[in-house]
Amino acid sequence: GVKPPPARITSYYLALAAGGALGGVLSAVAAPLALGDNYELHLSIAAAWILVLAVMITDPHSRLYDGRNMPRLAAYLGLLFAMGVSMGVYVYHTRSEALVIDRNFYGTLKVREIDAAQPQLHHRMLVSGRVIHGAQFQSPSLRRIASQYYSPASGVGLILTSQAAAGPRRVGVVGLGTATLAAYAERGDVYRLYEINPAVVRLADRYFTFLADARQRGASIECFLGDARLVLERQTPQQFDVLTIDAFTGDAVPAHLLTVEAFALYLNHLAAPDGVIAVHVSNIHLDLTRVVQAVAQQHDLDAVSVESSPDGSPVGSLAVWVLLARRGSAVLAIPTAKRLADSVPGDGVLWTDDVHSLVDVLR
C-alpha cells in the first residue's frame, strides 16, 4: 500500500502537510503573481502527463522503455500535443474576449467588451469566472441605465427611486462591483461604497463611468477599501437612508456579513425611522433569503422580498433582493414585494459570528 512502515510514519505525514502548505502558497500567492489568469490547473495536468511519460520511458519495467512500443508512445505524445493545443486555444479565447484581466489574492477579474460594433447594444461587463459583477452600456445616452441586478424594477432600484423625491439621501453600498448603484445618485446625495478587493475599485474607476458620472451630477462619492464590517465598526454612525449589502453572488460567501452581530452594526448606521437595509441574495447555490429572514426576526424587523426578471435586456439578470426596515415603517409598501413570514422554516438559518453553516442553506 501507499502507507509507509511505522518507522517512517512521522516523516510521511510531515511531507503531506508540507506539500499541502506549499500548494496553498503557490495557489494563493505565487500563481496570481506569475500567471495572469487561472492557468495553473491546465499547466498541472500537462506537467503530470509529462512526468508520467518521463517515468515510463526511463523505467526498464515499462512497455515504453527504450522505444519498445512506438505506437503507444506516439499515442501518448499525440494526446499531450492535443492537450497543448487545447490549452493554447483556451488562453487565446479568454484573452481575446477580455479588455483587461486583473488577478490577485481575491481572484481573477475580467472586463469584457461586448457588441462593440452595435452602438445600442455595446456594453462592458465585469466578470469573475461565471459571476457577473455589473455591466454598463457604452453609448453616452444609455450609460446611466442601471442594469443587471440593479434595474429600476429590482428591490434596490425601487427603494432608491421611491426615495429620490424626498431630497438628498445617504446611501451605503457594501460590495462595489462596477458601482452601478451610483447611477441612482443625484445632486446632494452622499454615497459611501465599501470594497475589500483593490482590483475591483481600480477597474470600476478606470473602465466604467458610474462613479465619475455621479460626481459630475453633484453627488458626493467616497470609496473605502477594506472589509466592510471592520470599516463600519471604526466609523461613527452614518445615518444611511439605504444600506445595500451586495457580496453574495459568487461561490465564496462572506458569512460574517450575514450574522446577527453584523446586522446589529448595520442598524447602528441606519437612519431612523425609515432607513432600509437592502440585501442582494441572488445565488444559484444557496438560499440566503432564509438567513436574512431569520436575522430580521431576531432584530424585530419587517422584511419583504422583491424578484425582478431580465425583461429581454442584453444586460438584464434575474435578481432577488430582501428589504428590511424597522417595524411600523411604511417604506416597504412596494406593490411587487412579497412579505416574508415571521416564522422561519427549517433549522440552522440564524447565523451568528460563532455558529453558521452553508450546508443548512444549500439549494
Residue ranges and their predicted role:
Residues 1-342, 346, 353, 357-363:
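Alpha-helical transmembrane segments of multi-pass membrane proteins
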